[in-house]
Amino acid sequence: MDPPSLLSLALLLLAAAAAAAFVLFPRRRSPEKKPSSGNPGSLSELIKNGHRILDWMVEILAASPTNTVATYMGVVTANPANVEHMLKTKFENYPKGDRFVTLLEDFLGRGIFNSDGDHWKLQRKTASLEFNTKTIRTFVMENVRVSVVDRLIPIFARAAASGETIDLQETLERFAFDNVCKVSFNEDTGRLSGDDTMEGREFARAFEQASELIVGRYKHPFLLSWKLMRFFNIGDERRLKEKIATVHRFATSVIRRRKSAASLGDDLLSRFIAEADYPDEFLRDIIISFVLAGRDTTSATLTWFFWLASTRPEVLARVEAEVNAVRRKNGTCAGVMFTLEEVREMDFLHAALSEALRLYPPVPLQTRACHESDEFPDGTKVRPGTTVMYNSYAMGRMKSIWGEDYAEFRPERWLDKGGGFQPRSPFRFPVFHAGPRMCLGKEMAYIQMKAVAASVVERFEVVVMDKEKVREKDYTMILRVKGGLPVRLKEKSVAAG
C-alpha cells in the first residue's frame, strides 16, 4: 500500500478510535460513577500500571471492601460470591459475549471455547460424554507414557550427562504440544523428538504465531481498529490471516484423512466423527479449540511448579518420598511409567500443583458480557453490555480467601488431617472455571502434569539457575515465565534401579 493510502488509513483509524471512545466507554464504566483520574480504576492509572497489570489489579481489588472494582476495562471481581453468581446462579445472563467471540472467531470459529447458547450446548454435551470415558483416559495415559519415557526422559538424561543448561519451559512446551495434538487428533507433530514432518512443523509454527497475533487484537482499545486492518489486509492482520490459513489447511487435511480411514482411533477427533456426521468446519473448530486449551496450560503450570518448588527444597523431597512410597506399594521400579491408579494416589503432588495453579493460573483473567441489568451479591450493579471479569490471579492472592499466608507457596493448605487432597470450591479457585462451563479437561490436565512431574522428580534433581531471582511474568494468552526457566539436571542413582 502506498504512503498516501497509509496516511488516510491512519487518519481513519484515529477518527474511528475517537468515535468508538465516545460510544464504548460509557457502556463499560461503573453504573454509579465514572472512574476519574487518581481513582484506582481510572484510565490514567491503567496506563501507568500497564507493565504490571496483574499485580496492580491485585492491589486495587484487595483494597476494595468487596474485592470488586469498576475500571475502564469493565467490572473486575475477585469475590467468590460474585464469581458463583456469574458462573452458576445467573449463568445465562453472563455469556462470552459478541466482543469476545468476534475477536477469536477467525481462528477458533465457533468452537466450544468460543461460542454461547445452543451451539455451545451441543458441543459441550458431546465433548462431556467423550471426556468421561475410560477409553479416553487410557488413551491419554498411553500417550503420556510414550512422550515421557521415550522422549522427555532421554532428552533430560542427555542434558544431565553433558551438563548443559536447558530451558525447561521451552522443552515442556514442545512436549505439551505433541501430546495435545496426539490426544486431539492422533497426529505426531514431532516437536519434542525433532522428527517433525514439514507439514507438522508448518502447522506448529503457524499455530504458535496465530495464537500470539490473535492476542494482539486485545491490545486494540476499539474493535474498529483491528477490523479495519483486517479489511485492508495489512500489518499483523495480514500475517494472522496467512497463519490461520495454514492451521485450517492442516486441520482440514487431518479431518478428511480420518473420515476416509478404514477404522477410527480413540483420539477426540475420531470419537466426534464416530458420534455423528458433523461438517468438516465444525470438527476443525473443535480440535483447534482443544489444541489451544491444552497447548501451553500444562507446560506453564509445570514450569511455575518447578521454580516454586526450588525455593522450598522440602517440597520436592516430600514429592519424591510420595513417589517412592507409591512405587513400593505397587511393586514397580523407577523408570517404568506410572499407571493411572498410581498417579491418582499422589495426593501431595496434586496439592503442590494446585498451589502452583493458585499462584500462577495459566489464564489469569476471564471475561463475560452482562446480558440484562443485574446486581452482584456484593451490591455492585451491572448494566447490559458491560464487560465483567473475574480475576483468578488476584483471587489466589486474597487474604480473605487463603489467610495470612496467602503469598506463600504452601502445598499443605490443600491437605486434610489425614494427608489426603482436599479440593476447594471452584468459585474460590476458578482456575478450571466453574458451573456449567467447568473445564472438561481438568482431570486430564492433572493426570498429565502429575505423570510428568513424578517421572522427572524420581529420576532427576532439577537445579534452577538463579533460583532466588523473582521470575517476571509473560502474559499474552497464557501466563508464562518471562525469558524461560534455565535449569541443569542431575540424574539420580535411583534411576538405574
Curated annotation (Swiss-Prot):
One annotated GO biological process: steroid biosynthetic process
Subcellular location: Membrane
Keywords: Cholesterol metabolism, Heme, Iron, Lipid biosynthesis, Lipid metabolism, Membrane, Metal-binding, Monooxygenase, Oxidoreductase, Steroid biosynthesis, Steroid metabolism, Sterol metabolism, Transmembrane, Transmembrane helix
Short name of one Pfam family: p450
Membrane topology classification: Single-pass membrane protein
Binding locations of heme: C439
Predominant localisation class: membrane
Keyword Iron annotated: yes
Tissue expr: Mainly expressed in roots and, at low levels, in leaves, fruits and stems.
Domain of life: Eukaryota
Enzyme class: oxidoreductase
Protein name, per record: Cytochrome P450 CYP94D108
Originating organism: Paris polyphylla (Daiswa polyphylla)
Gene: CYP94D108
